Amino acid sequence: MSQHETPLYTGLKKHASRQPVQFHIPGHKKGAGMDPEFRQFIGENALSIDLINIEPLDDLHAPKGIIKQAQDLAAEAFGADHTFFSVQGTSGAIMTMVMAVCGPGDKIIIPRNVHKSIMTAIVFSGAVPIFIHPEIDNELGISHGITLESAKRALTEHPDAKGLLVINPTYFGVAADLKSIVELAHSFDVPVLVDEAHGVHIHFHDELPLSAMQAGADIAATSVHKLGGSLTQSSILNMREGLVSKDRVQSILSMLTTTSTSYLLLASLDVARKRLATEGRQLAEETLKLANQTRDRLNQIEGIYCVGSEILGSKAAYSYDPTKLIISVKSLGLTGHDVEKWLRESFNIEVELSDLYNILCIFTPGDSQNDADRLVEALTEIAQQMSEQDVTHQQTEVLLPEIPLLAMTPRDAFYANTEVIPLKEASGRIIAEFVMVYPPGIPIFIPGEIITEENISYIFKNLDAGLPVQGPEDSTLHMIRVIKEQKAIQ
């Protein structure tokens, strides 16, 4: 088949055009049985293909027809041996690849700045995480990837590891030397798993970091919806045969996937793949041009710093994605969250994320020159407002806490006997739940780590700044769940 074809999307439209009488779910029956206002808003075309896995439309859990054809075309487009569609988001795809290689007690080497879905998979599987400290950018206050040297030390100390997981690229667009890391891991017969949630587009332009499949990785969870043009919650899992079992991946993915798979999501993956495969390079070229022009303009604004190629050069920053605009605002004396709120309220602009020091803006083929102009105008205005204030402000100091020590496996901690105590009194105790700022969803604490005063202070610093700290059962974070201490019987 040609990359210009869309077997799944075309098959759905053909089926809908026959207007069959539906005595099956979904109960809205092409919109006829739902609220009229919502039906009008969504549109009849979309509702006509909101279908289920009846025989003519194939089954994601055992694809043999139009879904298999669409997945095969995706594998060809991404240079994979096999591609699996996911309607459980990239989180579902990530959990699948971890659980496909790890069982209870198995070691997996991972950077500590992983997404919560990876740690969730480790809890589910019972795997033992071997953490690599990611390289820290103390100027920006963000984590990069892992270095070749740290990966080599981890593999040398733990040659029995069942997998090495790499983030490529990071949320902020920075990539390590993935090809060399893959070659190193393969010399130990260890498969490389890649969290490629923020890199679906990098496969299609040579000025972007190498994709997981280009670097020779064994399996990669790739988020098409984030930057590739499909609908939210749709993703793919690319893999190469050899160190990872295709049948095992299919089995685990099926276990984690709803039986009511959304054909709207699946169709959007099919058409997004077609556009990436046939127009991806040109689309990336135009996006890179707009992003780079915007970066140059932002760097003319006093107090604003938009990161460019100067971020490269460290061992963990081998290449980067210029379509991610990391905008440091600490010289304004404001937090990233302050600026995010101001952009929303004053210019109706929404950013991808903010932290204590930065905002992150993502450019895709969906952005226009007018959008870029508005961002530049807005940041020019807030910088001018800050410079005109009579009060002197100090540049925000970047503070990043040490990574906590892991005292027990995340699974053991998650299922242990626990109690709830005030967070302010929890220093020295072993935490039994996740604490993270979302986005990006990178844990401050994971179950099994020892709570420190430094990390408690960091949590309150994020809360005081208005950032979304999530994870604990107590959403106010006044209380935290910890492992119950076993006291001797008197």
Swiss-Prot record:
Xref: PROSITE patterns: OKR_DC_1
Disulfide topology: none
Subcellular location(s) per record: Cytoplasm
Any one GO molecular-function label of the UniProt entry: arginine decarboxylase activity
Top-level EC class as recorded in UniProt: lyase
InterPro entries: Orn/Lys/Arg_deCO2ase_major_dom, Orn_Lys_Arg_decarboxylase-I, Prn/Lys/Arg_de-COase_C, Prn/Lys/Arg_de-COase_C_sf, PyrdxlP-dep_Trfase, PyrdxlP-dep_Trfase_major, PyrdxlP-dep_Trfase_small
Enzyme Commission number: 4.1.1.19
Cofactor dependence: pyridoxal 5'-phosphate
Sequence positions bearing N6-(pyridoxal phosphate)lysine: 226
Function: Catalyzes the formation of agmatine from arginine.
Protein name per UniProt: Arginine decarboxylase
Species of origin: Bacillus subtilis (strain 168)
Underlying gene: speA
